[in-house]
């Protein structure tokens, strides 16, 4: 061996690190000595994927190693420490099932970190005697065996402390040599890329002691300098009465090229997935095992850990559990074809979102799973509801106009004849007054119906002082409110706040809102009217201390004939909403049981 006179620092085996991985490669446990040997605290590794800590060239090696359920040899790979340095790790794997029905697997990983010793050792037997291997742990190479392996189709070589002493014909072909003399007698380090030298030294020393070493991937160099990627399996042996190393090499250059192509394809696919505006996720055994960035935003999660590994049914209404479970199971078992269905979910902010969902069968670590694509249609659904509501308003308005005109004509005749009959009804004036007041109420309802049909009719918009307008409305209703123990309190940011609108229609709006607020407090209370403004809008809030509006009614506020009052017509708020809409304003309703209701109207300044 050409490096016999050079002192080297071989790698020594440290204490075992134990880890438990989920079937998808996510670390669910690692022993506390990870901080000492790898630089990471337990909490920094648990929840992460093992591959994020591996050298990129070893990721496929480890991944394929996990797929093999018969791990006869340990696997050696490079691990990236927290300080970004690289250490070699030798790992043994055991696959266990966590359920009797064998639906979930866990990977038990027993790792040894191979680090440099502080003392100097030499591979030269004359300067450093390595403890000989026991006869029981050693395979002897005899002349008969040598003739047997000569024509093996796989490259094979034998070295003594790194110095090549035998190669078969396949090894010659792989290294591009014409004769064995071009290889025998040379150090194996001459053919191995420098980045692997430290781990090779460690493996040689261990085999010199008769210890087994694991499988490893290495890059060797042919005689013409061309790199060749190899999978190396090694074991201790005895060759011509010397402790030696038996190497069986498999050319994986084609596999490496394929892995590179696959990795690039995977990266492009991941880039496409991560940047998709639709949510793309994978469900396995009822849990989220993958989700892209759009999904994290859709469910309003703070981090991936809020969703990954969690039960999907946590985001579903209990009524939907059975349907979704059956749909996912049928798709996973390919019993039904993929179709677009509508599905609602709960976000982490307890907000309901509406989605279109497509389920596609896929696999997750070789097991049946379902890929889910979710498209947020919450805004579309809201728009559809607004259009439906607008259509209802239009139909109700047309119906109201027809009814109002049909009733007004006979009503005018009835009132006229009652007026003529009044002088002849001495002693029955009380009944006359009741009938006449009810007819006046019918007239008021007819006026509201006509307002609903064409709220913009006869509208004369002008520059209005909002403080003055609300003051007039408050004065009109204040006397009746005080009789019921209700105080109307008004507050303004400024004395003069102006908007552009129709005075009569806006008075109708505030009369309806203040009157509703007063009627919601039969036991007395306070009605607050607050006027504020910002750069673009003027805001008017009418707030009461009543019992509040039930949640099931709150979402239907403004619908025709919807009322919570015993004598209400269900038209007042509908007219109010219509007038505000025709003034390019918006109205927001906030109500809490036993705490009251607030109607906030926002008008544009211009």
From Swiss-Prot:
The keyword Mitochondrion appears for this protein: no
Gene label: kinA
GO BP of this protein: regulation of DNA-templated transcription; sporulation resulting in formation of a cellular spore
Molecular functions per Gene Ontology: ATP binding; identical protein binding; phosphorelay sensor kinase activity
Domain (PAC) ranges: 77-116, 218-255
Purpose of the protein: Phosphorylates the sporulation-regulatory proteins spo0A and spo0F. It also autophosphorylates in the presence of ATP.
Listed NCBIfam families: sensory_box
Pfam families per record: HATPase_c, HisKA, PAS, PAS_3
Sequence ranges assigned to domain Histidine kinase in this UniProt record: 402-606
Principal EC category: transferase
EC number of the protein: 2.7.13.3
Keywords on record: ATP-binding, Kinase, Nucleotide-binding, Phosphoprotein, Repeat, Sporulation, Transferase, Two-component regulatory system
Positions bearing Phosphohistidine: 405
Name assigned to this protein: Sporulation kinase A
Entry keyword Nuclease: no
Catalytic activity reported: ATP + protein L-histidine = ADP + protein N-phospho-L-histidine
Domain PAS: 3-73, 140-214, 265-335
